[in-house]
């Protein structure tokens, strides 16, 4: 098991990464939060895979549990769904010291975090991420949010968990499409934070696709450490944390304009290709960087170009993004793997030009 610590203005928590950690949840939980009951928020599929075993494990350690099973999908990450959860917490007498355990992927983590942040002005939150994307990205850093009015993550806050337990054994049951989506965030982290990790992904693609436990624990730990290091420098996304949005400016617009039928990982993959091409157009990086990035993305079964888009609608969606500042769309561009930069004064014509080029 590997442990990564985050220290945020005196608040500390750990990200634990290893095999079969769900079977150790109670002991790990008690070390962080003394408790005798918890609320577990999950979805139908994850509950079927892990819910019964986790509930039995918690009970064997003297921890009672209420499991709330939600529908699957990004469309349910909403204020309506949060409003569905609050009465159940009230009816079961969940208190301010009753931890909420988010058992699932990014949607469950974001929604559970939002509920934990707002119920009784904040209750303890523990992430049990079961998807690759949530293990390397969404469970780390304290961003909690729901979608509203067709806009991705427009209602939310920063609310740090008390503990993250990433059981890489859960990746065995992850569908190929979801595994690829998680790889998009790993590629993103390598592109902005580590040329060495980028090379490692290029070199070890077959073993990673085979989900070798040793390699997965290593690259998940490296990716989590990259994000943790950035978050510790800029918890509330006012400066350097912006670089974690590489690929996300276009990515979120693609998700929103598709009514969230476009997966997050696929949208980010396309967004990274767009941002790297824009970087070349602006003379910031060599075309070789684009070729390496697009090949790596394609090698993991992710798209490199958008399908059936209207550039004007995409730009309008970008203007609703929370990364907009003073009316200017903020892009994270790339000089080379490991060297990102933040840019705001990008001409609309250049954005449209690259979108047309990629159609």
UniProtKB/Swiss-Prot annotation:
Chief location of this protein within or outside the cell: cytoplasm
Cofactor binding, note field: Binds 1 divalent metal cation per subunit. Can use either Co(2+) or Zn(2+).
Range of residues in the leader sequence: none
Biological-process GO terms, alphabetical: amino acid biosynthetic process; aromatic amino acid family biosynthetic process; chorismate biosynthetic process
Pathway where it operates: Metabolic intermediate biosynthesis; chorismate biosynthesis; chorismate from D-erythrose 4-phosphate and phosphoenolpyruvate: step 2/7
Binding site for NAD(+): 72-77, 106-110, 130-131, 143, 152, 170-173
Binding site for Zn(2+): 185, 248, 264
Enzyme nomenclature, EC number: 4.2.3.4
GO cellular component, one term: cytoplasm
Keywords assigned: Amino-acid biosynthesis, Aromatic amino acid biosynthesis, Cobalt, Cytoplasm, Lyase, Metal-binding, NAD, Nucleotide-binding, Zinc
Protein localization: Cytoplasm
Cofactor(s) in the UniProt record: Co(2+); Zn(2+); NAD(+)
SUPFAM superfamilies assigned to the protein according to its UniProt record, in alphabetical order: Dehydroquinate synthase-like
Purpose of the protein: Catalyzes the conversion of 3-deoxy-D-arabino-heptulosonate 7-phosphate (DAHP) to dehydroquinate (DHQ).
PANTHER family linked: 3-DEHYDROQUINATE SYNTHASE
Protein name in UniProt: 3-dehydroquinate synthase
Protein species of origin: Dehalococcoides mccartyi (strain ATCC BAA-2266 / KCTC 15142 / 195) (Dehalococcoides ethenogenes (strain 195))
